[in-house]
């Protein structure tokens, strides 16, 4: 079995430039966008060549959902939000990254 740390992974240069490293989850790198107006987090699966959700295998898609739910739950509680927004955009950065 290959450990996630052994899989080659390169973060898109725009994400690298515009974000602050927060931590590593089992599948994803967790970043905070460098934007003082909003608490804006990103989950990026540490897998090379992943541009769409369907590029992940079933186990990784499930893990991504678990990590997203975990992040959303904590953000909702911390900020006392009534509704959370999640987006998967790719119009500027093609690498799969989920906005929270």
Placement of each model-derived feature along the sequence:
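HIT superfamily nucleotide-processing domains
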Residues: 1-100
């Amino acid at each position: 079995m290959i450990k996630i740390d052994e899989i080659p992974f390169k973060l898109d240069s725009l994400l690298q430039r515009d974000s602050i490293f927060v931590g590593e989850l089992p599948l994803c790198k967790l970043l905070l966008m460098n934007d003082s107006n909003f608490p804006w987090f990103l989950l990026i699966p540490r897998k090379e060549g992943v541009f769409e959700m369907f590029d992940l295998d079933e186990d990784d898609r499930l893990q991504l959902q678990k990590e997203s739910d975990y992040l959303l739950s904590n953000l909702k509680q911390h900020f006392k939000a009534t509704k959370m927004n999640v987006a998967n955009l790719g119009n500027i950065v093609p690498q799969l990254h989920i906005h929270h």
